[in-house]
């Protein structure tokens, strides 16, 4: 993927707060299931904004930085998802989302970002991303010095 969409820490918080507004009233939720690792930061923000204390994880390995590979469930939360929000950072081709949907059919499944190929697996999201665009998450980046374009 040659196109990149960079999400800063500030943007991640802003986008996830927008998602939290869509999940009101908060008292309808028993808890949050974060899809590890991409859903961990959004889950923490949702937990704060919706005052939810019960946070669990489902751990699925499907990426090596920017290359998708075979999915493997490493850990899962109990139940069918009833009364729970399942959160991930994004839905891309829908492979992980399809598995999550099968595991937690009664959950409200949301992501911060969504690409066209996977949108139909989730219930809500905030940011539309083109299918050919790689998303750079803030936890995958560091601030570093860059030389000026023109040195005098």
Swiss-Prot record:
Binding site for xanthine: 92, 135
Membrane topology reported for the UniProt record: Peripheral membrane protein
PROSITE patterns: PUR_PYR_PR_TRANSFER
GO molecular function: guanine phosphoribosyltransferase activity; hypoxanthine phosphoribosyltransferase activity; magnesium ion binding; xanthine phosphoribosyltransferase activity
Keyword NAD: no
Signal sequence interval, chain numbering: none
GO cellular component entries: cytosol; plasma membrane
SUPFAM superfamilies associated with the record: PRTase-like
GO-annotated biological processes: GMP salvage; IMP salvage; purine ribonucleoside salvage; XMP salvage
Stated family: Belongs to the purine/pyrimidine phosphoribosyltransferase family. XGPT subfamily.
Function: Purine salvage pathway enzyme that catalyzes the transfer of the ribosyl-5-phosphate group from 5-phospho-alpha-D-ribose 1-diphosphate (PRPP) to the N9 position of the 6-oxopurines guanine and xanthine to form the corresponding ribonucleotides GMP (guanosine 5'-monophosphate) and XMP (xanthosine 5'-monophosphate), with the release of PPi. To a lesser extent, also acts on hypoxanthine.
Quaternary organization: Homotetramer.
Protein name as annotated: Xanthine-guanine phosphoribosyltransferase
